[in-house]
Amino acid sequence: MPLLQRVALAAGKRPSGMVDVKGEVLINGRPARAGAALKPGDSVATAPGGSAVFVVGRDAFLIREKSELLTAGSSALAGSLRLVTGKLLSVFGRGARRIATPTATIGIRGTGIYIEAEAERTYVCTCYGLVDLQASNMPEARETVSTTHHDAPRYIYAHGETPIKMIEPAPVVNHTDAELIMLEALVGRKPPFVGSGLGYKSY
């Protein structure tokens, strides 16, 4: 059974921790399996070809291969995340969250978001919701982005001559509406574009 279908079936149980593991995935440096507990303060890393779907509190995540994520927060909420490297699709419940990457700080308020973190550039697609973007190396370079359906992806760079050059428009890449629907289902929600008349897309 395909990953998206398996995970969607699990949604009725409101799972927590690791829901699906493909290939080599580590929690705090140790091999992870589906069903493993995951809490704020843990780290998740994937090897080439590895990926994982997991739930922490009201938030759900899909981490792709060659990625490393550090979490922090209370026992029920991962309030602060650091994507050291790699690719992460996330959906968040209400409340403030923060994600840091090598080049950006992203303030989140009830959002679906896709991030690709590299040493010199971060890609951010606010799939829906509201985020505050800030360049790490130039705090005055900032932008608030509000979208309903992948409307305003951005690159945030490590270096730039002016604030306007630190955050620039980007295309929509490497994530799908089906993945967002699957993640939201795990925490008992639907993306706002479901039922809105907007077509589902794969980018």
Feature locations, PLM:
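Flexible, surface-exposed loop/linker segments and immediately adjacent secondary-structure boundaries
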Residues: 2-43, 47-51, 55-203
